[in-house]
Amino acid sequence: MSIVLAIETSCDETAVAIVNNRKVLGNVVASQIDIHREFGGVVPEVASRHHLESINACIDTAFEQSGLSWSEIEAIATTCAPGLVGALLLGAAAGKTLAMIHNKPFIGVHHLEGHIYASYLSQPELEPPFLCLLVSGGHTSFIEVRGCGEYKLLGETRDDAAGEAFDKVARLLRVGYPGGPVIDRLAKTGDPQAFKLPEGRISLPGGGYHPYDCSFSGLKTAVLRLVQQFETQGKAVPVADIAASFQYTVAQALTKRAVRCAGDRQLQTIVVGGGVAANSGLRQILTAAAAEAGIQVYFPPLKFCTDNAAMIACAAAEHFQKGDRSRLDLPVASRLPITQVQTLYTPLVPLKGKS
């Protein structure tokens, strides 16, 4: 049993959770979407201020939901990388302070590793090896998971992340923020075959294309030109059809690469994580293609696709059981490759008896 309290403040969600191994006992998320909507995106300074205002109440509520006391918490974890530095600092300072006050081990967690572990919360029997398709506003990666802290990056976006592309296309279509849910909703009433959009392949120096890397900047530009074409002609922009065609193209690009990657690496399972994992088009297309290839696919419940502390606590519990601990002077970092997760930890050295 490993009961962990975790704090997640890497971007614009103030989240606190208490998890016992892979079972959620308390989970609180204070969203800032409405606050940042008027700016069309996250303002780092505003995000940090609201983290400061919300975090104590979130901690109290998580304890109320769990019915536990501080004496029952075995470790305290916070997201330490990657993310907005000011936001990360706020969460890390809170977690480290609580660890010192209550004399608990401190565990820093890589945000992307949290997304990998999100599916464990609904599929507690899930075990490596598997391929993780990690798709969010800041990342699009194909990661081979061999164990806790054991990751190999097989492919990634060369420019815009998938979630970032959704936000930018939503802005081009003037349909609101955040772009992911809006595009998904519009796509349900549009024709995904209305417009043929570029998938965004990466050319190799010796010819051919990279099997797993992807690009979404060209797709975004194609949507821009399509919108401009209709506006120049004085015609109404077919927003739903463009949204559906865009979403279909992104889902197809991710699906082709994920299924091929899993097949090439002889992995029988694909785990999807990140905010874009909530997209209904991706869920439908990837599930169908994977089933045809004899591959099992797991998507997190919708509430665990976006940023939350339950996934951070789950990842921390695995590291805690492994004997990993973080120093209280561990710095936060705006960037840290998923392959460098273990740099966050100092192995637990057993105390030696007196000779």
UniProtKB/Swiss-Prot annotation:
Cellular component terms per the entry's GO annotation: cytoplasm
Class of this enzyme: transferase
Family matches, as Gene3D superfamilies: 3.30.420.40
List of residues binding substrate: 134-138, 167, 180, 184, 279
Cofactor mode of binding and number, as noted: Binds 1 Fe(2+) ion per subunit.
PROSITE patterns: GLYCOPROTEASE (PS01016)
GO BP field: tRNA threonylcarbamoyladenosine modification
A molecular function (GO) term: N(6)-L-threonylcarbamoyladenine synthase activity
Cofactor dependency: Fe(2+)
Localization: Cytoplasm
Protein's UniProt keywords contain tRNA processing: yes
Catalytic activity field: L-threonylcarbamoyladenylate + adenosine(37) in tRNA = N(6)-L-threonylcarbamoyladenosine(37) in tRNA + AMP + H(+)
Record function comment: Required for the formation of a threonylcarbamoyl group on adenosine at position 37 (t(6)A37) in tRNAs that read codons beginning with adenine. Is involved in the transfer of the threonylcarbamoyl moiety of threonylcarbamoyl-AMP (TC-AMP) to the N6 group of A37, together with TsaE and TsaB. TsaD likely plays a direct catalytic role in this reaction.
NCBIfam families reported in the protein's UniProt record: gcp_kae1, T6A_TsaD_YgjD
Protein name: tRNA N6-adenosine threonylcarbamoyltransferase
Organism: Picosynechococcus sp. (strain ATCC 27264 / PCC 7002 / PR-6)
Gene: tsaD
